[in-house]
Curated annotation (Swiss-Prot):
NCBIfam families in alphabetical order: PRK00913.1-2, PRK00913.1-4, PRK00913.2-2, PRK00913.2-4, PRK00913.3-5
Name of the protein described by the UniProt record: Probable cytosol aminopeptidase
SUPFAM superfamilies xrefs: Macro domain-like (SSF52949), Zn-dependent exopeptidases (SSF53187)
Catalytic activity: Release of an N-terminal amino acid, Xaa-|-Yaa-, in which Xaa is preferably Leu, but may be other amino acids including Pro although not Arg or Lys, and Yaa may be Pro. Amino acid amides and methyl esters are also readily hydrolyzed, but rates on arylamides are exceedingly low; Release of an N-terminal amino acid, preferentially leucine, but not glutamic or aspartic acids
Positions that bind Mn(2+) 2: 263, 268, 286, 347
Catalytic residues of the enzyme: 275, 349
EC number in record: 3.4.11.1, 3.4.11.10
Subcellular location: Cytoplasm
Record Pfam families: Peptidase_M17, Peptidase_M17_N
Length: 497
């Protein structure tokens, strides 16, 4: 059942029935709120019998004892108080949400003895609850035998904390982050028959309501600009491509923007170099990079970030009809460099190279960061727990690595070098679009590097993290929204005036 939380922050609250969630750190004698919900003092014995010690994400769920104003009590562990991070508070909120699926109302006692609970921690806890509750089920006509399509469960949650004012302020900000993550998840989860390039562009245009300037380049306009690489990918589909440019002008007029570029292949059959049938349905998510960029632009605008930012997404469909490009074709990119197409399933880099060149040529950004579900090779190297980071700039790379650690959207830096560059030299053109099996994610990044000049640039290969990654306390969705929180943290920590 779709679930939504309505939050209230309060310094004190006496439950009138419902569930009470009491947080406790490892080693503490008692949890938060015990004086309110356990007047008879039975919780210590229950915790002992249930072997609950406050270990991170551990829980004990009991019927409320006689005399309690609550109907149900959930003890939830926070772990080591000294080591708590923002991500830990998110996970704790997600764990609480998972326990409250059958609840109608709940009281969360946040101020566990032994831990300094800030307003940001309270807000992160609430965001974690929302992230856990996200579900994409709009195409299910019935969720269960006794449930109509329109049913949505609303759980009223009171979060009890001494930092009410700070929590409310922080939650207003983190809610915008949640909205951006959910937008990215929605876009990745949407089926390709519903979300083509034109429809995706229309979704991006809705950001104008938040003050984002949005323009959409048509196929004709891209032809005039000479985007032969991007258009070559699109020519096998009856659905026309689009290039969407989103601008958020929250900084000083003279400041150069920070640029984010996303691969938006709304469905990838592989083209003439067609993919195997098994698992091909997941290629509706091959626009995870574009989804993350769109979600990020939503966040920056919604929270009125004091930065100038540009988001550019190249939207195409890679199909194998009679007009599709062939292995051996040579296309001319916007940069004037020619590319021999060895494998039509190495199409994302063809989309990105024109988008990167266009961005650099038009906006002269202070830095460019692209996101793409680019290679299966990165999944071989890193599985789906880290995204690959490639960069020509150590400072930018370190900023991204730190942001990844903070948000737990983790990155692992991969190499670039002349040796890899030689692997994409072509006998017939300036370069070829794949260097073969060995070092596949590296040669893909090396290809993109040829289109960024000397601008500080980073490439995030999110093929293993944007979709189908393992579920956890804050993500129960196939499409994860990976990259939105990471890049918002990057902006917040390094680029806002």
């Amino acid at each position: 059942m779709p679930m939504k939380f309505e939050f209230t922050f309060s310094k004190s609250h006496r439950p009138a029935g419902g569930s009470a969630v009491l947080l406790q750190v490892a080693g503490a004698k008692e949890p938060a709120g015990v004086a309110v919900v356990d007047p008879e003092g039975v919780l210590p014995k229950a915790a002992k019998i249930g072997k609950f010690s406050g270990k991170a994400l551990s829980s004990l769920d009991i019927v409320a004892p006689h005399g309690s104003p609550a109907d149900r009590i959930i003890l939830l562990g926070l772990g080591d108080a000294a080591a708590l991070t923002s991500h830990d508070w998110l996970k704790a909120g997600g764990a609480a949400a998972a326990k409250l699926r059958s609840a109608d109302k709940a009281t969360i006692f946040l101020d566990a003895p032994g831990v300094d609970v800030t307003g940001k921690a309270a807000a992160d806890f609430a965001l974690g609850m929302e992230m856990n509750a996200y579900a994409f089920d709009s195409y299910k006509t019935r969720k269960s035998d006794d449930e109509s399509k329109s049913a949505q469960k609303v759980v009223k949650v009171t979060i009890v904390t001494g930092m009410v004012i700070a929590a409310k302020k922080a939650f207003a900000t983190v809610q915008s982050i949640g909205e951006g993550v959910f937008l990215a998840r929605d876009l990745v989860n949407e089926p390709a028959n519903v979300l083509g390039p034109v429809e995706f562009a229309a979704r991006a245009k809705e950001l104008e309501k938040l003050g984002v300037e949005v323009e959409t380049l048509t196929e004709r306009e891209m032809k005039k600009l000479g985007m032969g690489a991007l258009l070559g990918v699109a020519q096998g589909s009856s659905r026309p491509p689009r290039l969407v440019v989103m601008q958020w002008k929250g900084g000083k007029a003279k400041d150069k923007p920070l640029a984010f570029i996303g691969k938006g292949v709304v469905f990838d059959t592989g083209g003439i170099s067609i993919k195997p049938a098994s698992g091909m349905e997941e290629m509706k998510g091959d626009m995870g990079g574009a989804a993350a960029v769109t979600g990020l632009m939503h966040v920056l605008a919604a929270r009125k970030a004091s930065v100038n930012a540009v988001g550019i997404i190249g939207l195409v469909e890679n199909m194998p009809d009679g007009s599709a490009q062939r292995p051996g074709d040579i296309v001319t990119s916007m940069s004037g460099q020619t590319i021999e197409v060895i494998n039509t399933d190495a199409e994302g880099r063809l989309v990105l190279c024109d988008a990167l060149w266009y961005c650099n040529d038009r906006f002269k950004p202070k830095a460019m960061i692209d996101l793409a579900t680019l290679t299966g090779a990165i999944m071989v190297a890193l599985s789906n727990h880290y995204a690959g980071l490639f960069s020509n700039d150590d400072r930018l790379a370190e900023q991204l690595l730190k942001a990844g650690t903070t948000t737990h959207e983790r990155l692992w830096r991969m190499p670039l070098g002349k040796e890899y560059d030689k692997m994409i030299d072509s006998k017939f053109a300036d370069m070829k679009n794949t260097g073969g099996r060995h070092g596949g994610s590296v040669t893909a990044a090396q290809f993109l590097k040829r289109f960024v000049k000397d601008t500080p640039w980073a490439h995030l290969d999110i093929a293993g993290t944007a979709m189908g990654s393992p579920t956890d306390e804050i993500n129960q969705s196939w499409g994860s929204g990976f990259g939105v929180r990471l890049l918002d943290e990057l902006v917040r920590a390094n680029y806002e005036s």
